[in-house]
């Protein structure tokens, strides 16, 4: 179905490298580059009336930010493993990666149990790890008096290269998109003091997550 949709999009002059083709919807990653005008949308609906086209500005921001990491992390025809569950972050990660099956010709291989990973022939593992995960981990280390380090600095596991496409994406963006789309998924709940502190600080300090992440990067580079 996805290949059929991609071919038809090409036929009506829509660049499918800038849209995510999901089960029952198409999500625009970049409206300008995709050239998915309202007129082309109407033409598309004549062929695929059951597939909804979504132009979420939140998802376009997510895709644009994630692309900065993916440009450096992905190579043509990479085989990328992705953990499949009902989590909102994992579903967002799949939506972000899906266009790269056409941009770079990557293959996405989904798995349900971490024990399966050892049996997979893949080049990279894309982890559903976002900006709030990193910042909350930094705060936990600070509160415990531990050395400051970035979880996303871990780049390999059992000879598999690890990548973090959503590392600069806040949790709020992810939940805003999945919520507005009505995507059935579970939130990555994290309890404790650190998440509450991040929320508290964000009400006073603009872009506090990004600033904490950059500070940790600076410390790492200047050790």
Protein language model regions, located:
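Mid-to-C-terminal catalytic subdomains of enzymes
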Residues: 3-9, 13-17, 169-217
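Active-site adenylate/phosphate-handling loop in enzymes that bind or generate adenylated species
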Residues: 98-173, 177
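C-terminal catalytic and target-recognition region of SAM-dependent MTase-like enzymes
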Residues: 218-223
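Proline- and acidic/polar-enriched loop/turn elements at helix boundaries
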Residues: 81, 113, 189-190
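Short beta->alpha junction loops/turns
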Residues: 33, 86, 131-132, 167, ...
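Phosphate- and divalent-cation-binding pockets in alpha/beta enzyme and binding domains
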Residues: 92, 134, 211
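RNA-binding accessory domains that recognize and position tRNA/RNA substrates
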Residues: 1-107
């Amino acid at each position: 179905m996805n290949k059929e949709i991609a071919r038809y999009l090409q036929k009506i002059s829509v660049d499918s490298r800038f849209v995510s083709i999901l089960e029952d919807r198409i999500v625009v990653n970049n409206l300008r580059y995709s050239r998915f005008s309202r007129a082309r949308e109407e033409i598309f609906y004549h062929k695929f009336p059951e597939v909804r086209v979504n132009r979420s500005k939140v998802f376009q921001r997510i895709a644009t930010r994630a692309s900065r990491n993916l440009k450096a992390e992905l190579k043509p025809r990479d085989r990328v493993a992705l953990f499949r569950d009902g989590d909102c972050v994992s579903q967002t990660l799949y939506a972000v990666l899906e266009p790269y099956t056409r941009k770079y010709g990557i293959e996405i291989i989904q798995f349900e149990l971490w024990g399966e990973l050892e049996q997979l022939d893949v080049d990279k593992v894309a982890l559903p790890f976002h900006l709030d995960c990193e910042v909350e981990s930094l705060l936990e280390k600070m509160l415990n008096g531990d050395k400051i380090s970035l979880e996303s600095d871990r780049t390999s596991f059992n000879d598999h290269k690890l990548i973090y496409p959503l590392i600069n994406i806040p949790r709020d963006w992810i939940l805003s998109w999945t919520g507005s789309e009505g995507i059935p998924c579970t939130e990555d709940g994290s309890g404790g003091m650190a998440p509450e502190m991040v929320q508290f600080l964000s009400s006073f300090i603009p872009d506090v997550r990004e600033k904490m992440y950059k500070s940790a990067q600076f410390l790492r580079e200047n050790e």
